């Protein structure tokens, strides 16, 4: 008898879960129409869509410009990286000095 009652409760929960799943699916479908940022009016009027198209065109032009003349710009970038590497090495030396001072003060205590 206990098996029958367990099966009945399992069936009820399964039915409940199925109905809850349907409710969640409906809520999700309804939520897709609403933008997260709350600009529903602008999107419906097409205002944001026009802005996005203009931004995409500008991005494409930038990519084309970057492709031209990379040979000349590459040398300058290498020089800048080399200078930065030297600074990084100098900064490491300074950090070592600070650590040594800290060790001395720890020994004095």
Curated annotation (Swiss-Prot):
Entry superkingdom: Eukaryota
A GO cellular component annotation in the UniProt record: nucleus
Annotated region described as Disordered, given as residue ranges: 1-109
UniProt-listed InterPro entries: Pro/parathymosin (IPR004931)
Biased composition (Basic and acidic residues): 9-35, 99-109
Bias-annotated ranges (Acidic residues): 41-81
UniProt note on tissues of expression: Highly expressed in the testis.
Principal location class: nucleus
GO molecular function, one term: histone binding
GO biological process: negative regulation of apoptotic process; positive regulation of transcription by RNA polymerase II
Record keywords: Nucleus
Cited Pfam families: Prothymosin
Localization annotation: Nucleus
Coiled-coil spans in chain: none
Sequence similarity: Belongs to the pro/parathymosin family.
Function: May have role in testicular activity.
Protein name stated in the entry: Prothymosin alpha
């Amino acid at each position: 008898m206990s098996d029958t009652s367990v099966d009945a409760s399992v069936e009820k929960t399964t039915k409940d879960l199925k109905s809850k799943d349907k409710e969640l699916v409906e809520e999700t479908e309804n939520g897709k129409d609403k933008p997260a940022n709350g600009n529903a009016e602008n999107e419906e009027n097409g205002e944001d869509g026009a802005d996005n198209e203009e931004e995409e065109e500008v991005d494409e032009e930038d990519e084309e410009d970057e492709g031209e003349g990379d040979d000349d710009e590459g040398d300058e970038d290498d020089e800048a990286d080399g200078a930065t590497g030297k600074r990084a090495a100098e900064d490491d030396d300074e950090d070592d000095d600070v650590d040594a001072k800290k060790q001395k003060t720890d020994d004095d205590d």
